């Protein structure tokens, strides 16, 4: 203790903070945590179908983000294992990856729900809320992993911890925090894989397994196209093994590539994507995030083995590295589009495309402004792809007009802006190229050179 001389206090003796202060601080922090998670956990008592589809992507995103700052790593491998508990018949979901160890901050961010680093442009995470979505499987989750045990990130230890987020009221959630802390165990030895284990006991959780795996199968090839960090992904669904492997990319032209993904399992197939990209320094992004930032965009179309375009109507075609599941109710366009710089809503189900584009008070671009700015760079990519496909006479080019006949109504979409600055732009580009296959055998024509005959419903049914 030492005397403190202050003209307002006289001479006082400083003492350590009273123990009651520390205990009160812990209680307040616990209540702040409850405030942070309670609403979302309550929503997940009756999860939406989109929630049930998203859990696998949230886990893949977390795995990918573990190497965002690790200069010694550029790829990870993932295993998803679905099995039955032989003792009680419950389903067990195990998600494994061999990414980098947790930092102390990242581990606590996962356990206490906050996003560690939105400013890192290599990190896909936005809000720290995504992992909560995985609780549509189960609100009790056991984690086995490794963490750096020193600030210099030179030493590693293993750990296990079980999250208990199954409480109904605040006091039960706080009790779950106590149980979580008591479950923590640290080891000198490390684990080969980071593993998240969910014991699924409810019908809703079993439905989440079903919808999540269906969405996984539909979108994993596109995700691997845009997420170069994924070297391989293996799904073991009760002994039925599916492996997705990236094949070497083929350079078709100076800026057009072909990427293929071999899917092996009960049936074998190869999914093929023709794609191009844009990456340039962006002043507005750099100013907003106080760091040198590039705007990055990928645009792709899927083609089959006969070089016909694949229909993407009604599918998830927008990616912020991971698929923005649910965005199909807002946007329907001719391309599969990815940008790590997209600004989605908090549940990653739509893009923010309404409201002001510039924050005058802070003198920075808004989330809406960023998304609109990304669109300006999509159209040159669309033009390159349409030209390549038309020049090489790919089939079913009418899919390049997908979504261009109408605009969806959505609360986060400025309908008038979207029609003038998106739909009309796509149409202008499409009119420039020979994309219509004439029925008289005279080859491909520009749309303005064609006469379109509207067939009756009966004629269409007969074809």
Residue ranges: model-predicted function:
Residues 1-76, 80-84, 104-113:
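Bergerat-fold GHKL ATPase/HATPase_c domain
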Residues 2-21, 25, 38-42, 83-84, ...:
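GHKL/Bergerat-fold ATPase module
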Residues 43, 66, 127-129, 182-183:
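Eukaryotic intrinsically disordered and solvent-exposed regulatory patches
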Residues 45-49, 119-127, 367:
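Alpha-helix N-cap/helix-initiation motif
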Residues 62, 66-70, 98, 104, ...:
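Domain-wide signal for the mature, well-folded portions of proteins, strongly enriched
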Residues 86-96:
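Short, highly conserved beta-strand within the GHKL-type HATPase_c fold
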């Amino acid at each position: 203790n030492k005397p403190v001389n202050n003209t307002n206090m006289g001479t006082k003796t400083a003492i350590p903070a009273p123990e009651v202060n520390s205990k009160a601080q812990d209680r307040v922090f616990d209540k702040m945590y409850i405030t942070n998670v309670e609403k979302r956990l309550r929503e997940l008592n009756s999860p939406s179908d989109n929630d049930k589809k998203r859990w696998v992507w949230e886990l893949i995103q977390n795995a990918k983000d573990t190497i965002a700052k690790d200069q010694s790593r550029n790829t990870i491998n993932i295993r998803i294992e679905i099995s039955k508990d032989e003792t009680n018949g419950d389903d067990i979901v195990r998600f494994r990856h061999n990414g980098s160890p947790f930092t102390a901050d990242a581990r606590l961010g996962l356990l206490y729900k906050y996003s560690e680093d939105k400013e890192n442009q290599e990190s896909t995470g936005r809000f720290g809320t995504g992992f909560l979505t995985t609780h549509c499987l189960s609100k009790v989750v056991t984690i086995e992993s490794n963490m750096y045990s020193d600030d210099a990130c030179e030493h590693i230890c293993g750990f296990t911890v079980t999250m208990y987020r199954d409480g109904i009221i605040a006091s039960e959630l706080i009790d779950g925090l106590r149980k979580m802390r008591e479950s923590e165990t640290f080891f000198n030895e490390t684990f080969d894989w980071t593993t998240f284990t969910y014991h699924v006991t409810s019908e809703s959780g079993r439905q989440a397994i079903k919808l999540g795996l269906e969405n996984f199968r539909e979108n994993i090839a596109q995700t691997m196209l845009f997420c170069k960090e994924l070297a391989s992904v293996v799904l073991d669904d009760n002994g039925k093994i599916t492996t997705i492997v990236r094949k070497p990319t083929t350079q078709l032209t100076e800026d057009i590539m072909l990427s293929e993904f071999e899917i092996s399992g009960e049936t074998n197939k190869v999914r093929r994507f023709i794609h191009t990209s844009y990456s340039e320094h962006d002043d507005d992004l750099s100013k907003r995030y106080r760091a040198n930032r590039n705007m990055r965009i990928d645009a792709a179309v899927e083609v089959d083995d006969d070089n016909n375009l694949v229909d993407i109507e009604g599918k998830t075609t927008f990616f912020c590295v991971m698929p923005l599941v649910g965005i199909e109710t807002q946007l329907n366009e001719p391309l599969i589009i990815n940008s790590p710089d997209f600004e989605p809503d908090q549940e990653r189900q739509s893009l923010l495309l309404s409201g002001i584009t510039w924050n005058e008070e802070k003198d920075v671009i808004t989330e809406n402004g960023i998304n609109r700015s990304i669109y300006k760079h999509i159209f040159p990519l669309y033009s390159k792809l349409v030209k390549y496909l038309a020049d090489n006479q790919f089939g079913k080019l009418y899919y390049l007009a997908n979504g261009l006949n109408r605009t969806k109504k959505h609360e986060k979409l400025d309908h008038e802006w979207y029609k003038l600055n998106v739909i009309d732009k796509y149409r202008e580009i499409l009119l420039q190229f020979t994309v219509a296959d004439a029925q008289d055998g005279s080859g491909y024509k520009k749309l303005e050179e064609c006469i379109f005959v509207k067939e009756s419903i009966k004629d269409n049914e007969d074809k």
